[in-house]
Amino acid sequence: MTEQTYSLIFMRKNFVLACAALLLCAPGFAQTQKANYALAERFSAKRVNQMVFSTQITPNWFRDSDKFWYSWRTPQGTRYYIVDPVKGTRTEVFDMDRLAMQVTEFVRYPFEAKHLPIRDLRLKDDKEFTFSIISGLKNDRDTTCFRYEIATARLDTVAREKDKYPRWASVAPNGEFGVFAKGSNLWVMDSTSLRKAAKDEKDSTIVEHRLTTDGIRQFGYGYGNYSGDTEADSTKRHYPGELVWSPDSKRFATMKWDTRKLDDLWVINSVSDKRPKLESYKYQMPGEPGPKGYLYIFTMNDGRTGASARQVKSQAFKDQEVSLQSARRTAKDNYLDYWKNEWLGDNTGFYMVRQSRDLKRLDLCRVDVDSDSTKTIISERERTYVEYRTPFLIGGGKQILHWSERNGWANIYLYNSDGTLVRNLTEGAFHVEDILGVNEKEGYILLSACGVNKDENPYQMHTFRVPLTGGALQQLDMNDMDVLSTASDDAKFFVANYSRVDWTPAVALFSATGKRIADLETADLSLLFEAGYKFPERFKVKAADGVTDLYGAMYKPYDFDSTKVYPICDYVYPGPQVEANNISWSRGFTRTDRLAQIGMIVITVGNRGGHPNRSKWYHNYGYGNLRDYGLEDQKYAIQQLGARHPFIDLDRVGIHGHSGGGFMSTAAILKYPDFFKAAVSCAGNHDNSIYNRWWSEQHHGVLEKIDKGDTTFVYSIQTNPEIASNLKGHLMLVHGDIDNNVHPANTIRVVNALIRANKRFDMLILPGQRHGFGDMNEYFFWRMADYYAEWLIGDSERWKPDITQMNND
């Protein structure tokens, strides 16, 4: 062999080695990556609940003052506090060590302060607490009830109190009697019989009187008219009456619904009993005939044993929606022995909202109970759909605080009760979410709103004060946080729960002037951080139009190495009622933080059409294009992040979602088959022509056609089965087999289309599970983790029969 031949062989060998080295360094082909099952196992839902305790406060306001009490749990146990906003003090309710010793003496079973299982804690008369303790071994447990005097710290045992009124009774505001439904008709009991029924519904001394006789199955009164119970069951069981009361307890209003033309839908529970069980329920799909509602006002007789009924003409639109408006509950209402449900109004009349089936027309009406007349007070008209909030009455009912998106943003308007517009209370390019409270004496309202601070994430909610005379908004809480506030009845104080997706949750107490009275709590995440937890990172990108800002969060593996390259998975929900993107911190991160630990970058990001808390243009962007509207934005967001971060491998892109996100993730891998390589789609409404009418028609639109006086509704929409033949990547479809929200037929139709297109795919049916997957969520997680580990990471335990991580949990 000549020297020249040796040189040629050597050159070729070096060339091959150089090419191999380049390939090994190339993104997506690169270094061998191992899926980190152990790190994902460390943050199971069960284990996170052992590391994360209280993150928010629910203030329980006193009945006759601005004080409130709350509980707060940490790794050191649960503590209970009373806060006096006027004095600016916070006092522990119990000396927990002393209380544990006292309880131990009473029940003869040992307890210590950190593990004292206080249940059913209730404040009575602003002076004492009652609670119960379960003691003993598993097979020999007792419940002991206690009364604790706040002023003296005295502890006594008391008889166990049951609910004084059954929950199925709609009790009159005066508490003297209650109305309920049975056998599609309305009945009444006095308070004596109601209390007996709360203890034992079979008590033979209970007296009930029938109020109606015209109700029949599927055309009757109360909740039982819509339930899936058999006819025999519905004549025996008690159901809520679904009614609203006049403040003087003399009248109530209710709707009688005719649902006979609504078709049935079914699921079969294959694991319920010895025989599979058929569940039937009424389910209206888009374009199908709707129920007819009839408004009735009942006047109780003096003996409260009967009532006269009058039908009120309220029809304005075919297949209209009708909602009887309820007065807002106060802190004092929480101390009643029953759930108070007064109508919004006074003894002479009440308010109702009626809306056309296409939701483009809405009327706020007042019903006069003496003349049975219905008067339109405020009308809203849109070319997409109208949304609303319950009105707020002030000035003894003479004025109305009305929420509207008529100018493209959600603002508050002040009306007189005759429908005359007085003024705009807020007017700007921001979103008012709700009225938190009103102080008429001092002339202001407290409200929650977002998008006011233009240098912040527009989803971050804040608390504002605005004069009833109109004027600029005054922000009362902290900047650059997402704030969830609860106000006292007089709106003089509010409790602010605040956090960000990258900030530890905390709680502060404010006055209505903006004074920060006290920092109450900060969540203890120490155990979580000790386990290796790290906050996600916030980011901002552009939508596919290059103009609209989109906001998201990036979740990295906790052992992230910036020198490595990772696949990326997009956790999606298209909206339009909410986006998958977390704004505040939450412990529910199985599909984001935890999924990333397998060895991926996981992101959540909004898309045009995804959320109502921005402009109405943004919210309604997907109207008429419900399948595809958010897909381009999601793809473009990922591409921007890939260009921004060298550790993201755009050749290994996954997508995942549940419900609407299941629908969206499948649509994405079918619309962009060369971009998305793997999708796990759960409980998806893949064919919105068979999803529920309300959601599908509202967010996509329905055509109202009037021909020779006859009104019909036509619905047409693009579906995932129509594009199943586009599949190139790896798709796993998951559904609970008794999902009565998004029927399994949605997934089966995609399966049918894939089979007929000769496509390989994966499918997981979860037996006996409804829309949320119930006790099979952990099993589902590992099947999802296996799928992405195999197709995006290249290292999976998918083919092992045992999920050992679940056995260790």
Predicted regions and their residues:
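Serine-hydrolase catalytic core recognition
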Residues: 59, 264, 338-339, 347, ...
